[in-house]
UniProtKB/Swiss-Prot annotation:
Catalytic activity: dUTP + H2O = dUMP + diphosphate + H(+)
Origin: domain of life: Bacteria
Alphabetized UniProt keyword annotations: Hydrolase, Magnesium, Metal-binding, Nucleotide metabolism
Entry annotated with the keyword Cell inner membrane: no
Gene name for this UniProt entry: dut
Biological process, per Gene Ontology: dUMP biosynthetic process; dUTP catabolic process
Chain's role: This enzyme is involved in nucleotide metabolism: it produces dUMP, the immediate precursor of thymidine nucleotides and it decreases the intracellular concentration of dUTP so that uracil cannot be incorporated into DNA.
Cofactor: Mg(2+)
UniProt record similarity statement: Belongs to the dUTPase family.
Annotated GO MF terms: dUTP diphosphatase activity; magnesium ion binding
EC assignment: 3.6.1.23
Descriptive protein name: Deoxyuridine 5'-triphosphate nucleotidohydrolase
Taxonomic source organism: Clostridium tetani (strain Massachusetts / E88)
Length: 145
């Protein structure tokens, strides 16, 4: 396993550093710095009070917490959200309430997970033809049930 250093700046007095719940977890929990109600069918930007400096050639992916989704129908709207290495602003999480009741976000609540991933840069080449493959143009359920 490759280890990187993630630099984190706390922007608010009540902000918390991201935390791994267990040693082998891929994602670290992100915490809300605000109280907010999300009505059913609505979404809201929830601020974390942190900004980060990612290691070179990495990205941060923002992913939902399974417990929020299962128990409340609340998930991250743009999943996975990508934070590029050059971004230095406050991390905000767009949560959507697919449940039937209002959802109360509370200060200090775990609202999402952040996973740090290496990135691969590719050279882009325009071509007239692509090579054949076994799958071809099949998609959207083409492999059956």
């Amino acid at each position: 396993m490759t280890e990187y250093t993630l630099k984190i700046k706390l922007l608010k007095e009540d902000a918390k550093l991201p935390q791994y719940a267990h040693d082998n977890d891929a994602g670290m929990d992100l915490f809300s710095t605000e109280d907010k109600i999300i009505n059913p069918g609505k979404h809201a930007l929830i601020l974390t009070g942190i900004s980060i400096e990612l290691p070179e050639n990495t990205e941060a992916q923002i992913r939902p917490r399974s417990g929020l989704a299962l128990k409340n129908g609340v998930t991250v709207l743009n999943t996975p959200g990508t934070i590029d290495a050059g971004y230095r602003g406050e991390i905000g999480i767009i949560l959507i309430n697919h449940g039937e009741k209002n959802f109360q976000v509370e200060k200090g609540m775990k609202i999402a997970q952040m996973v740090i991933k290496p990135i691969v840069k590719v050279n882009i080449e325009e071509v007239k033809m692509l090579s054949e493959s076994q799958r071809g143009k099949g998609g959207f359920g083409s492999t059956g049930k």
